[in-house]
C-alpha cells in the first residue's frame, strides 16, 4: 500500500454546478409577461409569436397568455404565447 497520496489525488475532487436548463413552463399553462419559458444552449426551440429571445438563448413571454409548443417539421420547434384578452 502506498504511504503517500499520489500526485493527482489532491488535485481531484471538483465538480461544476448544474446549469438548470430545460422547459420551465409547459404547453397549455397561463404565464405572465416576462416569465421564462425555456432555458437552453443554442436554439433547440425557437421563439414564435409574443416570445422574446435572450442573449443566452433563453425564451421568455412578452405578454400574458397561454403557452403553445409547435413542431413545424424542417423549420424546427417553436413556442408561441396566445395572448389572453
Swiss-Prot record:
Q: Check the record and name the Pfam families matching this protein.
A: Ribosomal_L27
Q: An example Gene Ontology cellular component term from the record?
A: cytosolic large ribosomal subunit
Give TM segment ranges: none
> Does Transferase show up as a keyword for this record?
no
**What InterPro entries does UniProt report for this protein, alphabetically?**
Ribosomal_bL27 (IPR001684), Ribosomal_bL27_CS (IPR018261)
Establish whether keyword Lipid biosynthesis is in the entry.
Answer: no
Q: Which UniProt keywords apply?
A: Ribonucleoprotein, Ribosomal protein
GO BP annotations of the record are: translation
Q: Which residues form a coiled coil?
A: none
Q: Which domain of life is it from?
A: Bacteria
Q: Which HAMAP family match?
A: Ribosomal_bL27
What's the family?
Belongs to the bacterial ribosomal protein bL27 family.
Q: Which PANTHER family match?
A: LARGE RIBOSOMAL SUBUNIT PROTEIN BL27M, RIBOSOMAL PROTEIN L27
Which protein is depicted?
A: Large ribosomal subunit protein bL27
Q: Which gene encodes it?
A: rpmA
